[in-house]
Amino acid sequence: MPESTIPALLGRYRPQHVIGRGGEASIFKATDELLGREVAIKLYRSGGEEEMAQYRTEQAALARLSHHGIVSLIDAGIDYTAPKDPRPFLIMELVSGTDLAATLAQRELTVEEIAEVAYDISEALEYVHANGVVHRDIKPSNIMLVSYGTTTFRARARLTDFGIASGIRNAPATPEDGKTTGTAAYLSPEQALRRPATPASDIYSLGLVLLECFTRSVAYPGDAVESAMARLDHEPPVPGDLPGEWTRILHAMTASDPAARPTAKQLTPAFREAVIAAAGLQPKA
């Protein structure tokens, strides 16, 4: 069905225009006609088996998670306008800003901004992991830098896209035969080996994201196979001249052994101190 002919979903959410596209879904800016507010619609392109599995996984994950570091789920359903091609959708809060990938393509981040991203996402992952969920696809394009439209509040990093999360009822704990979970450039070594992802896998991926924030280059470039296999051969090159404790922290986050990586609970206070140090402030007594 042409996107321009999509009706109001659930009788109240009317799509306006596309604001993003992914491999399985399009994101629309839309109007909640009942409450008179703007929302986002994630509309899957088909109701095939793979799309339905991702829809169910993301719906279940977001329904049980409520945190300021995660883009919130409002509603969900299936569009039966074309009976032979039903399409699942998620109604989510509409956030103003850009994703981290687009920001890195445009400009260099300050150390303070990197520390803020690290703190925000680590805090979100601390909550996610405490609830038994593993994201499995931490990457710059899944981190939104949300603007509040005022100079009083800084942009906040928020985590999106739980379509392949694990720890959800009926979501596979291990990859299907011949498949990996996640995006090649940001996979943990255990994901590259098609082993189950754990909270430590998310920490590794976040470490690669933060390293990219400093270097503005992908640690493991190349095609999917080349990129995935490179991390089994060597750990990522972390510059030795990063400010403060950054070199040590990034080495720890990207350790080959999952057991050697810090947890999100351990990282969150460290990143809070990094924000304070970068801002030139002193912690309160």
Describe the function of each predicted region.
Residues R45-R64:
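AlphaC helix of the eukaryotic protein kinase fold
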Residues P15-G22, I27:
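Protein kinase glycine-rich loop
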Residues V117-A118:
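Activation segment signature within eukaryotic-like protein kinase domains
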Residues S122-V133:
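Protein kinase catalytic-loop region centered on the HRD/HxD motif
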Residues D202:
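Conserved catalytic-loop aspartate of Hanks-type protein kinases
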Residues P83-D99, T103:
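Conserved short submotifs of the Hanks-type protein kinase catalytic core
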Residues A76-G77:
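Activation-segment/catalytic-loop signature of the eukaryotic protein kinase fold
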